[in-house]
């Protein structure tokens, strides 16, 4: 027996348990891993589902904790990507309910902000990992490689993910930062354009409501908004959202008008770009 070669394999209890899950679920290179993404931010949800598909996974996206429970009841899943903050169920509460329902798939928490205490709380609740949004394609692939031992990264054309051309009108605008946005979506222009279109629709829908939203609802929306801003490269809007969040925490509303102005300007730029 070649002991040197044997030593190269990871035989830790965690690795063995993960392999056992893969085989018990029937996951092989001929059956793509089934992954559930739960996120109430439409831009984050769309990107993660699209990126997982490009990475050879069968991804299902839902926008609430209750929908996640329903999806888990319908099929055997290999991995869960669960937003930490959703209006109905999220974080430790959602994972506890999923475990009660019999779902044993490893769970990764996602959030626009993750400090050390929050990561510790999520780990104590049973999450195997946590990732800060926006989650790029390479980071997503690394998570799959760590938690799905039987996942095989699909071969891609070396130029398939490279940015081609530029967003000529948008690149001249201080409202949009194309390089950072393209990097967050793996250099895929079509994906970025689709996400920006979806984001523009959301902003148009929310714009009339921002001035009258209760502070707690506005705070929850701003939390989701920041992840979308990073995926779409809407720099000015991200800065305005962060300032308004700080103002809300101080019980002031002076930054709300600034956010409304940034929303209107961003919508116009996204539609023109």
What are these regions (language model features)?
Residues 83, 111:
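Active-site residues of response regulator receiver
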Residues 70, 92-104:
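Short amphipathic alpha-helix used as the core "switch/output" element in two-component signaling
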Residues 91, 123-130:
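As written
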Residues 64, 89-94:
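Acidic catalytic/metal-coordinating carboxylates
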Residues 128-129, 135-273:
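Two-component system phosphorelay core
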Residues 32-43, 48-52, 80:
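Conserved acidic segment of CheY-like receiver
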